[in-house]
Each structure stands twice: as structure tokens, then as C-alpha cells.
Amino acid sequence: MKFVAFERAKQGTGASRRLRITGRTPGIVYGGGAEPQQIEIDHNALWHALKKEAFHAAVLDMELDGKDNKVLLRDVQMHPFKQLILHVDFQRVDASTRLHMKVPLHYSGDENSPAVKTEGCIANHVITEIEVLCLPTDLPEFIAVDLSGLKKGASLHLADVALPKGVTAVTRGNKNPVLVSVVVIGAAEAPVAEAGAAPVAAAAPAAAGKAAPAAKAPAAKKK
């Protein structure tokens, strides 16, 4: 993806506030063996770009002062309750240095799998992104995962996924985590049904234990 940024001359809280009033967002670009540079970006263009998955996970082309820079989005500061981007950080990319990034997983085909189609199960997406290590030219926007082979009682692990060339998964603790689990629909709904039946069952002892109204004393006989 490509976007345009401009060099920002004035710095400081007051200058940034005035910049936002004019519809621009302050930011910074750093790394890559060069000095950090203050920048500004059109707020509306940045707002729409942030809605795209690739803007968060891919190497971006930033045009700054007529020159193209390869950068990564590193941080976005949002206003606590307004639809306003307060500040944005980018990191320059060195073509010879490997990147440590999070890449989204795009699942597909589960509706055609035996587990979902004929065995009464659903596919539970346990993990939706993984951390990877790769060169900038090898960084994928996403990793496609085919679930059409899922069967009842099975799970899909990280080791079952073919990663793109030059991409290595980074894991912590569990070296082969579960990405997708297969859940039987009836088993998933059973606890809900039992929980709903509990108040009815509890009502029975209460009704049984309710005291009968006291009988009236017989009227005294006239002498």
C-alpha cells in the first residue's frame, strides 16, 4: 500500500493540536539508520487506510518529500472517545534485516469439511494471527489456511500449516499451538440447556416446602 506524508516543521503539544484542527495528523518515522523525522498525514486518508488489514501487517510505501520510503506501522494513538487519530508512528525498513511481525490468518473451506458438513461440528478459530520472522520482501499480508480437511475429533496445529517461503513462525511456550479446534454442536449447547433447567428444578422444593394456610378454629357452641 502507498500513502503520502509531509515533513512537519513545528513540534510540541500546541503545534500538534493546531495541526489536528486543520485535518492533519502528526506522526514520526524512525529507524533504518537515519535520524527520526517528524511528519504529518491527511487525517481522513489515514483514517480509511487504518481500516484495511494490509496497512497493519504489510510493508508500506510512504512518499515523503518526493521520495519513496519502505516503512511499517508501529503505533497508533487514538482519542479516548472521539473518532480522531492523535499520533502515528512508522519504522523504516532495512531490506537486509529480518522483521518480527504479526501476520493475520485467513481461514477458509471449513463449511465444506466433513466435520461441519456431515458430522455436526463447528470450527472454532482459536488463534487469528501468528508472529513471524522474515525479510521485508518475504513478509506476507496474510497467511491462507485451508480447513476443508477438518474431521470430527481433530484439531489444526501450527505445524500443519505451510508457511510462505522465507517465513518462520515465532512461538513462546507451546511450540505447536492449536489454531483451530473442532467442536460438536450438541456438546457445546448442552451446558446452556442444563443451566436453563436449574431454576425450574429449584422451584419444586420451594413449592413443596410452602406451609399450608392455618385452619380456622371451630366456632364455640352456644349453651
Curated annotation (Swiss-Prot):
Keyword rRNA-binding set for record: yes
UniProt xrefs under InterPro entries: Rbsml_bL25/Gln-tRNA_synth_N (IPR020056), Ribosomal_bL25/Gln-tRNA_synth (IPR011035), Ribosomal_bL25_b-dom (IPR020057), Ribosomal_bL25_C (IPR037121), Ribosomal_bL25_long (IPR001021), Ribosomal_bL25_short (IPR020055), Ribosomal_L25_dom (IPR029751), Ribosomal_uL5_bac-type (IPR020930)
GO biological process, alphabetically ordered: translation
Entry keyword set: Ribonucleoprotein, Ribosomal protein, RNA-binding, rRNA-binding
Molecular function GO labels: 5S rRNA binding; structural constituent of ribosome
Function of the protein: This is one of the proteins that binds to the 5S RNA in the ribosome where it forms part of the central protuberance.
Family in the record: Belongs to the bacterial ribosomal protein bL25 family. CTC subfamily.
Protein name: Large ribosomal subunit protein bL25
Organism: Albidiferax ferrireducens (strain ATCC BAA-621 / DSM 15236 / T118) (Rhodoferax ferrireducens)
Gene this chain is encoded by: rplY
